[in-house]
Amino acid sequence: LLLLPCLRPPAAAALKPALAPIVQDRPFLVAWNAPSTRCLSAYGVPLNLDAFGILVNRREAFAGGNVTIFYYDQLGLYPYYQNSSVPPTAVNGGCPQNASLQDHLGKMVKDILRTMPSESFAGLAVIDWENWRPLWIRNWDKKNIYRSMSAQLVRRGNPGWSDEQVDLRAKWEFEKAAVNFMSETLKLARSLRPRGWWGYYLFPDCYNYHYWDDFGGYTGHCPPLEVQRNNKLLWLWEQSKALYPSIYMEEVLRDSPQGERFVGAKLSEALRVAELPSARHSLPVFAYARPFYTYTLKELSQADLVHTIGQAAAAGAHGIVLWGDVEYSRNRSNCQKIRDYLLGALGPYVVNVTLAAQLCSRHVCHGHGRCRRRRPDSTAYLH
């Protein structure tokens, strides 16, 4: 065990003080966000997540008092294009500047009251909107449709404008509406359920996926341009109550220094962004991770459990959210696979990391903070 500095509120601290854990005496929290309720109800396979100290909703429901995630069609009237149709179909206006913010907020009230019936909801509250990004320049590849459709809207009203004039106006209209849509959504959510830890999934990201370009020379570092772009999202960090970056690992990164660097850089950028808002404290960071390699049901190796869960704890994150989809409870075989994984490598490792975080907090921080690495690029771990 390497002794790490304590993240707490001393007067001379270079870092902002951290908020208290959302669960008492749990400086590092591991939460479950997967629809696994059918494993027990349909197949008689109990996962017993509580036995490993994993925070889970009642009956392992996907949405509940501890963790709730809203997808694009579950909160208000989110505008987007259905890319699967030819030509793409606009839903709720398609682009944010072509949508009704008031109608969206009105529907959103009903959705939150239905999904979060308790006014005292104090769990993780995650909004997963991935169809478009609020910065115009980041709408590349399939998301380029939001730039092209925005330009069409401008050209329709200004047929004599040059392409440059159209693009400048389209960018301004899109970003202005995107900011309003995302920030007003957070404001309303926080007013309705003020104790919830509201934030957007995948924010921040630093787009350090270039391991495909030069695997051997991959450093993991976030491109400086993307760091600058994250700084432009200060309005979003000011409205967020928590940050939910993703540290999903593809199998190509298995058991490699590149995988450790990939995750480490994402965590470092999220923790940097957490310091940017004007609040006295830093924002809590809960990194979304998969216990399996992305797009598979292949278990993370022991080394990659360390590179994800262990590294998040050592870096100073508030916790990890283990995400899964309907495949987890698709059949008895998948449920049994998850149970065996929990009993084998995953569950004991979660216990190890959370206990190490508790002990370090008690002995180094006197129970009033979280241990974290002295240097973001360090490879020190809590266990």
Positions of PLM-derived features:
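N-terminal carbohydrate-binding/catalytic regions of secreted carbohydrate-active enzymes
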Residues: 38-115
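Aromatic-rich peripheral "rim/lid" segments of glycoside hydrolase catalytic domains that contact
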Residues: 307, 311, 323-375, 380
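Aromatic-lined carbohydrate-recognition surfaces of secreted/lumenal glycan-active proteins
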Residues: 166-229, 263, 278-294
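A solvent-exposed, charged loop/short amphipathic helix patch at secondary-structure junctions
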Residues: 88-95, 139-175
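Conserved, mostly hydrophobic/aromatic
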Residues: 127, 243, 312, 320
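N-terminal signal peptide
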Residues: 2-26
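Glycoside hydrolase catalytic-domain groove-lining segments
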Residues: 232, 236-239, 244-294
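Alpha-helical scaffolding within the catalytic cores
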Residues: 53-56, 110, 222-234, 265-274, ...
